[in-house]
Amino acid sequence: MLPISYTNLNSSRITRDGTASSASRYRRLIPEYFRRIFHYPQMDIEYTFWIMFYLCFNPSRVYRVTSWHKQTKNQWARDDPAFAVILVFFMAIASMSYAITFHFLSFLNVIKVMFWAVFVDFITVGLLIATIGWWVTNKFLRVSVHNHSVDQSVEWLYAFDIHCNSFFPLFIILYVVQFFLLPILLSNSLFAAILSNTLYIIGFSYYYYVTFLGYNALPFLQHTVVFLYPIGILFALYIVSVVMGKNLTVSIINFYFGFQL
């Protein structure tokens, strides 16, 4: 019989236990959503493109699927980061296209435009909007809970999902459609100003509409119509901008690229 070293056995057990405990701590500290960002095979790309398609043409259908997700995964939020990852990729390509179009050709300038579009416009603003939506809904819009009812609340990640869903149609309108209409939108005419401002009011109104649908899909929230109120403000600003002859496309391009068109 071979001699057994209990010291080695114990150290081996400690190593295995330590590795297991480290892995469990890692899983607790980093949610599955963020871990899967680095595991492309775990992302459901086909389902993500299905969501993107219907967000543009029938967004209410997307949120009907949300209730099924709650029943199967016991959470409202997506556990798959594919949507955010693909949207970031699309935004990087679009912002790089704008940089090339306006002769922002140096490497640092291209990175600057991509960084601003992805990490400021989409991620930073999105984190802020999601946090505000999460706080407002949980603080003011939840239905009163009865004694024997389960207390439910809006998940922060679901609020961020809503932002991602709402941002995609806005991206299509204000990044993609606007890009192909630039020869018209940048002309010095009243028609160009009206067309440009119409694109912006459609894009942002659609953003708030999809946001409303997202929160309205939660059965424990009430008065979610408040998420449609900003559309009225947008319409008033639209009228003012048209009367003043303000072209929002020109203003945005001047802001991003630092020159006067």
From Swiss-Prot:
InterPro entries: UNC-50 (IPR007881). The chain crosses the membrane at residues 37-57, 82-102, 113-133, 166-186, 190-210, 225-245. It is a multi-pass membrane protein. GO terms for cellular component: Golgi membrane. It is found in: Membrane. It holds the Pfam family UNC-50. Keywords: Membrane, Transmembrane, Transmembrane helix. Belongs to the unc-50 family. This is Protein unc-50 homolog.
